[in-house]
Amino acid sequence: TILVSFSDYKIIDKELAHHLVDIGEIVFFLLGAMTIVELVDSHQGFRLITDKIKTTNAVKLLWILSTITFFFSAVLDNLTTAIVMAALLQKLIKSREQLLFFAGIMILAANAGGAWSPIGDITTIMLWVGGQISLNIIPAIIIPSAVCIIVPLIYVSFKYRGQNIKRPKNAKEEKTRDVIPYERNIIFTLGVLGLLFVPVFKTITHLPPYMGMLFSLGFLWVVTEIIHKGKDHVHKHSLTVPGALSKIEASTVFFFLGILLAVGSLQSGGILNSLATILDDLIGNIYLINIFIGFLSAILDNVPLVAGAMGMYEITSTGPYAIDGEFWEFLAYCAGTGGSLLVIGSAAGVAVMGILKINFIWYIKKISFLALIGYLAGAATYILL
């Protein structure tokens, strides 16, 4: 698309450099988060959660995990939470079909949870930093966001009524059974605190989130080297950052990179900005515009769409375009949750797709309808409130 849109190679080079900077931040963030999660996993840290979840009832487990995901996303952000939940689900569910279905629901919950927090999604962070929204978005959007995940959960509760899940036998835990409890507790606690530190770091320093993530990873690296310094090299390697990095699949990162570059080419070609202008001219109604942006975000990614909307509309002192105005609040909801309609429509979806190898067509058949009814129900709730 870039080659078609620009005949001057200098412009192509400039645009590519611009997008690689933005995409690089997301990729480094993803690498840092995945490494921390893998480090916690290698120390059996997730057993602190999985051992407390005793139920094998599919419906009850779905509600428990969705609730955890919904609120974690508001604090950690939806991408990090989705990565954590993908690792957690593999510890809880043996059946491949059930694992993928639960993962699909977690994508919905992660995106719904991220939409009502200024730090829960990259688009809400953009709107927060840009001055379009403040912490007042929380009471305004939390109910529609909750409806967005509750409606699909009610629907699938009937489908999974009476069904149970089987726990997998984890070979990895057998190999690392000599990890003592205090090591597991330390790494789990520091891993969670490290992830929670990222939005705090962003708020205090105003530096990109990936720097906070890499700082947390660096701190964990030092800690693991200290607590495992007396162990033999083979055992120590599997419990430190170099070992965790070696277990991360490069295909996941490259897949993520390819998706973002494709979207960047559409943005550089002016296609996304043209679509935003057409929406404003043809529709006009702020609710319908945002609902349509939500649908588009499932295909074209929500970041450039929100960026385009921020460039099209100036902040006013009163009305729907004021700070915390209806347009910006509803944009945060629609852009955040609309991406759930397709697995490639959100960073959380793309990450889980890569980690668990979710098929694009499978997601459309099994999850997209649930995402649609939740998205529309939440939108209707916001409009009515």
How would you describe each model-predicted region?
Residues 2-9, 20-21, 72-79, 83-109, ...:
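Membrane-interfacial helix-loop connectors
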Residues 95-96, 100, 116-117, 126, ...:
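Juxtamembrane and boundary regions of transmembrane helices in multi-pass small-molecule transporters
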